[in-house]
Amino acid sequence: MRAMVMDAAGRPLVARDIPMPEPEAGEVRLRIEACGICRTDLHVLDGDLAGPKLPLVLGHEIVGRIEATGAGVTAMSAGQRVGVPWLGSTCGRCRHCLRGAENLCDAPVFTGYTRDGGFAEYCVADARFVFPLPDGGDPVALAPLLCAGLIGYRALKLAGPAERIGLWGFGAAAHILCQ
């Protein structure tokens, strides 16, 4: 399959043929319809975030359709449209995971950083961390919702029934939240 691969920080991505990923137990493989480009992707590429797996396929705003499922995946099936976000999986055992704050996990896996992401024709993802998406939606419009959209939604949910909220800065998350 074709992918845009990062070999080192500060160097351009390279179009390359790489092996088709196979889903392991608990994973799904999807054919990618769209993948957004987030500022975080640029931070990884520029070397601002240390420690990415190399070589690496960037991209964590992924929209695609499931083509294959690994053992134990029963809630999703081939042909289903799903989204894959930055948080690719968590340990489920640390104090943060146990209290429902998976975003603070002690041993997270990040899509397009510590595992290959969506700047490719296909990717694999942990089935517990993908979101069902509507069949009729535009994949290009849906992709940013898997990063900035989730951040904005979480902020609004944490605000509770407040009549007013403050927005610090006005990036993609705030823009989507206001819509």
Q: For each predicted feature, which ranges?
A:
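Glycine-rich beta-strand-centered segment in the early N-terminal region that forms part
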Residues: 21-35, 46-95, 129, 134-137
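Short gly/ser/thr-rich secondary-structure transition/capping motifs
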Residues: 10-15, 47-49, 113
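Cysteine-cluster motifs in flexible loop/terminal segments that predominantly coordinate metals
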Residues: 75-76, 87-131
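Short Gly/Pro-enriched turn/cap motifs at secondary-structure boundaries
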Residues: 19-20, 53-59, 111-115, 121
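Cytochrome P450 core scaffold surrounding the K-helix E-X-X-R motif
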Residues: 40-43
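Mid-domain Rossmann-like dinucleotide-binding core that forms the NAD(H)/NADP(H) cofactor-binding site
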Residues: 82, 135-179
